[in-house]
Amino acid sequence: NQATDHPTHIALLAFEKYIEDRLGDKYNVEVYPSELLGSQTDMVQLTQTGAIDFCVASNSILETFSENYTLFNLPYLFASQDAYNAAMDDSEIVDPIFESTARAGFEAVTWIDAGTRNFYTVSTPIHTPADLKGLKIRVQQSPTNVEMMDRLGGSATPMGFGDVYTALQSKVIDGAENNEMALTSNGHGDVCRFYSYDMHQMIPDILIGNCAFLDELSEDERAIFEEGFQLVNLVEREEWGKAVDAAKEKAQNVQGVQFLYPDPKPFQEICEPMHEKVLSQYPDLRPIYQRIQECNAKYSPGTE
């Protein structure tokens, strides 16, 4: 569902070339950007049925197919970018989640970095949770995100991403939360003056594949596809870092966005009870959660 200059699309083009260079006599890869095949929900359903073989889906959509994906939506699940990368590269963490949708006809084949989600506002700088009080903040259409916003004192306003710019411009909402690229690629920085690095979520996008297609691959073919999936991850992460740097520079120097760096700890302390609530509801996730905490301990800010 991304434009052709987006890191995800660039990574999928690398996958296309890799597969066709090695298996082009049998497989022709076609990449469709910009929701040409429909919404993300439509594409997941098409992947389920085998009408298409792969698609990139957001974690919040996959949560409707498997409660295991609820874990990644938790605010302040990861202590740092390094902890996030280490956890997402750990098969003992991701495999039980990635394989949990097999009964629905698809499974995850790799993760895609979608950055860190932070608050940005039209006119109110966010330094502490108290600054969110009474502000109407657009959140993703997910119960987890609504609860997070309510706990932080803001007024959660779920809406589709395509409606956010107009809502900001017309002051229907006071702000939103997303990564830096929303400021530039989607023009939100033309309306919003402040972007606050509270670092509340690091949620991956997921490349999923149709199970029947994957099962029909020969052993050698599957090995080549697995290399291709790994390439998607590596290329996207590299491109993502460059894209975020460029977005931040444009937002600051062209759009006039002011970047703020509040202490995340007060935000984290307010949201922390959500972790135990989810683990009590889905106890099978607790061992995975504990392994993530090991990554957090190893890669927490300030540790060598």
Residues covered by each model-derived region:
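N-terminal secretory/targeting leader peptides
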Residues: 1-84, 92, 101-304
